[in-house]
Regions:
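Outer-pore turret/helix-boundary of cation channels
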Residues: 64-96
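Interfacial helix-start motif at the membrane-water boundary
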Residues: 50-65
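Short, strongly hydrophobic alpha-helical membrane anchors
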Residues: 1-12
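Pore domain of cation channels
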Residues: 20-25, 91-132
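Membrane-interface helix-loop junction between the first two transmembrane segments
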Residues: 26-48
């Protein structure tokens, strides 16, 4: 049997953590869009300023979401059997955020590669980043 499937409880934890992270990210994205929409609806705001508000707000929201996934990656790396990241000699928080950024944006330079159940979170993060 493939070693990836020997620890079903760890795989379940990764799926659960992924679902929770995606749910939180979607909620944050939704609430920020609602807030932005209300702010832009105010009369008297020049159109150019509305565009700037939109760009800066959405940039901030996406960066926040990258950090949220980075936290999930870092926490899952602490769980024995959840996988590891090739290219990350000593797992640390900033490398987890970097992995999250290249995954969320689907850049995928190839210098960090998730292995094991952690791939589920990474694949789902890429999908979330694409539709966000």
């Amino acid at each position: 049997m493939d070693p990836l499937y020997d620890h079903w409880h760890v795989n379940f934890l990764v799926v659960l953590a992924t679902a929770a992270t995606v749910a939180l990210v979607v909620l944050v994205h939704y609430e920020c869009l609602v807030w932005l929409s209300a702010r832009l609806a105010r009369a008297g705001t020049p159109p150019r300023r509305k565009v700037l508000y939109s760009i800066y707000t959405l940039l901030g929201v996406h960066i926040t979401e990258i950090w949220m996934f980075g936290i999930a990656i870092r926490l899952l790396l602490l769980v024995h059997g959840s996988g590891h990241v090739v290219g990350m000699a000593m797992p640390n928080f900033m490398d987890s955020v970097y992995l999250s950024a290249i995954t969320y944006t689907t850049v995928g330079f190839g210098d960090l590669v998730p292995v094991g159940a952690l791939r589920f979170l990474s694949g789902t993060e890429a999908l979330t980043g694409q539709i966000g």
